[in-house]
Amino acid sequence: MAIPSRLRRTTDQREALLRDLVTDLIINDRITTTEAKAKSVQRVADKMVTLAKKGTLAARRQAAETVRLEDAGEGKDALQKLFSVIAPRYNDRTGGYTRIIKTVPRRGDAAPMAIIEFI
């Protein structure tokens, strides 16, 4: 098993970054970020969808530890959208809920960029 990237941050900073990116992915269905961050977000996002597919109260509480309470429009927050909109899409799928598409390097520092989105 590969060692996850530390993204040059302390543990608290890295966890906060991943929470923000996963929440943004749930709200917008697609985000643009660096390749390293996209790979880290993919692991967490797939785990959140798997929890949401279970649909239990315990799964909802576990997902609430990671997903921030931000407005996702339509009178729902990100956690509600995860459980009521995103999870039902993947009832027949056992994994691989997201894809990473590489894009052109970022202007300025030439960092490799990628788009991560729900399939």
Swiss-Prot record:
GO molecular function, one term: structural constituent of ribosome
InterPro entries noted in UniProt: Ribosomal_bL17, Ribosomal_bL17_CS, Ribosomal_bL17_sf
GO biological process, one term: translation
Assigned keywords, A-Z: Ribonucleoprotein, Ribosomal protein
Ribonucleoprotein in keyword set: yes
GO cellular component terms attached to this protein's record: cytosolic large ribosomal subunit
HAMAP family: Ribosomal_bL17 (MF_01368)
Family: Belongs to the bacterial ribosomal protein bL17 family.
Subunit structure: Part of the 50S ribosomal subunit. Contacts protein L32.
Protein's UniProt name: Large ribosomal subunit protein bL17
